[in-house]
Amino acid sequence: MKVTVDQDLCIACGTCIDLCPSVFDWDDEGLSHVIVDEVPEGAEDSCARESVNECPTEAIKEV
């Protein structure tokens, strides 16, 4: 599984980072970005998909 963050939609609320710090972190501009090429198997169902579903601006997409 792969995920992306649309930087144009990200409002830096931090929800994804709080939910899934093994996949998301802050970038130099204070926005969320993906820090892994592939979501680790254990994180797919537990936090990555939850981050996709909980993002208030739908900036996170599963690809």
UniProtKB/Swiss-Prot annotation:
State the UniProt keywords alphabetically.
Answer: 4Fe-4S, Electron transport, Iron, Iron-sulfur, Metal-binding, Transport
- Give this protein's Gene Ontology molecular function annotations: 4 iron, 4 sulfur cluster binding; electron transfer activity; iron ion binding
Can you tell me which residues bind [4Fe-4S] cluster?
Answer: C10, C13, C16, C55
Keyword Iron recorded:
yes
Q: Tell me its cofactors.
A: [4Fe-4S] cluster
User: Per its UniProt record, what InterPro entries does this chain match?
Assistant: 3Fe4S_ferredoxin, 4Fe4S_Fe-S-bd, 4Fe4S_Fe_S_CS, Fe-S_cluster_ET
Instruction: Please report the stretch or stretches of sequence annotated as the 4Fe-4S ferredoxin-type domain.
Output: 2-29
Task: Recite the UniProt cofactor note for this protein.
Answer: Binds 1 [4Fe-4S] cluster.
Q: Look up the domain of life of the source.
A: Bacteria
What the protein does comes down to: Ferredoxins are iron-sulfur proteins that transfer electrons in a wide variety of metabolic reactions.
Return the protein name.
Ferredoxin
| Organism this protein belongs to | Moorella thermoacetica
